[in-house]
Amino acid sequence: MASVFGKPRAGGGQQSAPLEVNLAILGRRGAGKSALTVKFLTRRFISEYDPNLEDTYSSEETVDHQPVHLRVMDTADLDTPRNCERYLNWAHAFLVVYSVDSRQSFEGSSSYLELLALHAKETQRSFPALLLGNKLDMAQYRQVTQAEGAALAGRFGCLFFEVSACLDFEHVQHVFHEAVREARRELEKNSLARPLFISEERAVHHQAPLTARHGLASCTFNTLSTTSLKEMPAVAQAKLVTVKSSRAQSKRKAPTLTLLKGFKIF
């Protein structure tokens, strides 16, 4: 049976239940978050979209021969992280996006990684994050070098990629599937660590919202010092993937888009 998005599932035999993964796309306005999301879901590149539109999309994917029900939240923060509990408490993994031709968007991505590090420290949990330099097709106007991107990713212990949403679908798909793999590893680790029995009832302590505990207004991190944060432990060296221009088209039939309201698709 064919899926709405992603690869159709093979027929015959008993299918295992799909893994459910929630992925939040973070970054400053103009970094290309919506373009990446639409490219992944439809193989198409959009030239116009509403920067204030935030929505969540679903895609049936197959990653490493395992069915995955992937939900992608295309967030609509403007210039700084705001009302961040909506995705911090929802996502299993995060894709932090900046544009290689914008120093401001790169600095904004650092704020998002700091936010995730603080959230991990407060919750005593690990949240996989991938740093993505977008608009590689604009490399002649670079303001952020590959080395700077790799250094920032290494500082927070996350994977690093550079892609272009308008050029190559396969590499964009690879990044999203890597996010699924990172989330799956973390989910499996948490599942193994979960106790099998609860011997006694324990009082549940409700923590105050992230902003209230740290005196932060709407999760804005403009004045947050990086030295006050305990960075996420580096589980692996930052990996750099540089995507070159490619016009090769995949043979997979382009899926039908049903949820992308407010986009002008070409």
Swiss-Prot record:
Keyword Cytoplasm: no
Keyword Flavoprotein in annotation: no
Keyword entries, A-Z: GTP-binding, Hydrolase, Nucleotide-binding
InterPro entries in UniProt: P-loop_NTPase, Ras-related_GTPase, Small_GTP-bd, Small_GTPase
Binding locations of GTP: 27-34, 74-78, 134-137
Enzyme Commission no: 3.6.5.2
Swiss-Prot/TrEMBL catalytic activity: GTP + H2O = GDP + phosphate + H(+)
GO molecular function, one term: GDP binding
Pfam families: Ras
Gene Ontology CC entries for this record: plasma membrane
Matching SUPFAM superfamilies: P-loop containing nucleoside triphosphate hydrolases (SSF52540)
Family of this protein: Belongs to the small GTPase superfamily. Ras family.
The protein's name: Ras-like protein family member 12
Lineage, uppermost ranks: Eukaryota, Metazoa, Chordata, Craniata, Vertebrata
